[in-house]
Regions:
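Sequence termini and other peripheral, non-core segments
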Residues: 1-16, 20, 253
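A polyanion-binding, active-site-adjacent surface
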Residues: 6, 28-190, 201-202, 207-212, ...
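Generic N-terminal amphipathic, Lys/Arg-enriched alpha-helix
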Residues: 13-34
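A short acidic (Asp/Glu
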Residues: 191-195
Length: 256
């Protein structure tokens, strides 16, 4: 079903309905992290603000803020892609950074990601914007903030999500012996030092690559433009140099 033919913004299944959401689907390694956060002072403050916003009628995306943690197990993470916050348009955000469901037109940031993927590795541009296949093959698709209000980019940047997303990326550094982190934009790059230092304390290899956010507003901007950054090829080459037989899973693409 096309995005134009369905009122995603009003659909009860494509917006956050309650807080906290069910945690049963979280994969091993993640549930304790999320539960500890929700029980903390920071987590309780975030919960209170989200609950109040929903009670006042705010439209909040995505419907499953923790979806990335239901598709990529902690011990299987090979790459972390870290963005800023979910898409803020109706029917776009689905709980995986930059991903949209099949049938939804890829937003400009995702189109730039596909262009860079093609330029870097020669892979065909996919027919839709779903990155679920990546998530199931060790790519943790995470934003620094896990919720956003309809039509208001960055609206939940100060809600308190960073305490949890900091812990998530540090947990990856603690558990993964070799992981690449692709940090796109200033919000993501603020976590670089914590990622590297945590990995070093545990004797693990961490490779951090930084570039501007793939949004058209910044993708070509100096000094670290996203377009031409080569992150996909560089990440794959580094992992293979660590002895890992890993390459970017090819997404659904048109027949050659």
């Amino acid at each position: 079903m096309s995005q134009q033919g369905f009122d995603w913004g009003l659909s009860a299944t494509h917006r956050l309905q309650q807080w906290p959401p069910a945690l049963e689907g979280l994969l091993p390694g993640w549930r304790e992290t999320v539960e500890d956060f929700l029980a903390s002072d920071a987590g309780q403050a975030l919960s209170a603000r989200l609950t109040q916003a929903l009670a006042q009628g705010a439209v909040v995306y995505p419907p499953e803020p923790f979806r990335a943690l239901t598709l990529t197990a902690l011990d299987e993470v090979r790459v972390v892609i870290l963005g800023q916050d979910p898409y803020h348009g109706p029917g776009q955000a689905e709980g995986l950074a930059f991903s949209v469901a099949p049938g939804v037109k890829p937003p400009p940031s995702l189109r730039n990601i596909f262009k860079e993927l093609q330029r870097s590795l020669g892979l065909l541009i996919p027919v839709d914007g779903s990155l679920v296949r990546w998530a199931r093959q060790g790519v943790l698709l995470l934003n620094t903030s896990l919720t956003v209000e309809d039509g208001q980019a960055g609206s939940h940047a100060s809600l308190g999500w960073q305490a949890l997303t900091d812990e998530i990326v540090c947990e990856v550094s603690r558990k993964s012996k070799a992981c690449v982190s692709l940090l796109w934009g200033a919000h993501a790059q603020a976590k670089a030092q914590a990622i590297v230092q945590t990995a070093a304390r545990h004797g693990h290899a961490a490779h951090v690559l930084c570039a501007n956010h793939p949004s058209p507003l910044s993708a070509l901007r100096a000094p670290t433009p996203f377009m031409g950054c080569g992150h996909f090829g560089r990440a794959q080459a580094w992992l293979q140099a660590q002895g890992l037989d890993w390459c970017w899973p090819e997404l659904d693409a048109p027949a050659r």
